[in-house]
């Protein structure tokens, strides 16, 4: 049973987050180990395993990048945790330039405003790539979707770096 089947959801990238959350709570309640406290050792062990499976599946499906990686893995394209280098030199150059721009924000006359503008630009880029991943997955373009997910991971990492700079600026 795959993660989508576990939650009774269609195997697709786009999903209703609130429906996922409610199904998660429902399954969590049903298979909570406390419900099996008086059951046999075997049933207690199975409930613990099922609860762990439910938690793992929820964490994967809840986040767009891990959900896309999971869908790709289901299609035989395992990219989770891979160390493959990015093959798109233009994208890598753009990422280097964006990181340099982020580093320079602290020296701006109005760093908070500059950071807000930069964050907006990167968020827009993230959303565009996310929409492309969804389309490529829907169209069964697995290799293209895998490349796009790799790029999306770079952009997500940049978004995390923006948050760190924001924490420094706002103290």
Swiss-Prot record:
GO BP terms in the entry: [2Fe-2S] cluster assembly; protein complex oligomerization; protein folding
An example Gene Ontology CC term for this record: iron-sulfur cluster transfer complex
Pfam families assigned to the protein according to its UniProt record, in alphabetical order: HSCB_C (PF07743)
Record carries keyword Chaperone: yes
The keyword Magnesium appears for this protein: no
Domain J residues, every copy: 2-74
Keyword entries, A-Z: Chaperone
Coiled-coil parts of chain: none
Any GO MF annotation of the entry: protein-folding chaperone binding
PANTHER family listed in its UniProt record: IRON-SULFUR CLUSTER CO-CHAPERONE PROTEIN HSCB (PTHR14021:SF15)
Function: Co-chaperone involved in the maturation of iron-sulfur cluster-containing proteins. Seems to help targeting proteins to be folded toward HscA.
Binding partners and assembly: Interacts with HscA and stimulates its ATPase activity.
Xref: NCBIfam families: hscB, PRK05014.1
Family: Belongs to the HscB family.
Name this polypeptide is given: Co-chaperone protein HscB homolog
Organism: Vibrio parahaemolyticus serotype O3:K6 (strain RIMD 2210633)
Lineage start: Bacteria, Pseudomonadati, Pseudomonadota, Gammaproteobacteria, Vibrionales
């Amino acid at each position: 049973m795959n993660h989508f089947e576990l939650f009774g959801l269609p195997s697709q990238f786009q999903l209703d987050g609130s429906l996922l959350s409610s199904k998660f709570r429902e399954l969590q309640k049903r298979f909570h180990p406390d419900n099996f406290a008086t059951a046999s050792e075997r049933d207690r062990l199975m409930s613990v395993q099922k609860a762990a499976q439910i938690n793992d599946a929820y964490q994967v499906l809840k986040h767009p990048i891990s959900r896309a990686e999971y869908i790709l893995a289901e299609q035989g394209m395992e990219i989770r945790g891979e160390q493959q280098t990015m093959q798109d030199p233009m994208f890598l150059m753009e990422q280097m330039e964006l990181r340099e721009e982020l580093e320079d924000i602290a020296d701006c006359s109005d760093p908070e405003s500059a950071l807000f503008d930069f964050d907006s630009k990167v968020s827009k880029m993230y959303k565009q790539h996310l929409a492309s991943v969804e389309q490529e997955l829907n169209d069964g373009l697995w290799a293209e979707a895998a490349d796009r997910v790799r790029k999306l991971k770079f952009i997500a990492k940049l978004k995390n770096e923006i948050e760190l700079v924001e924490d420094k600026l706002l103290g």
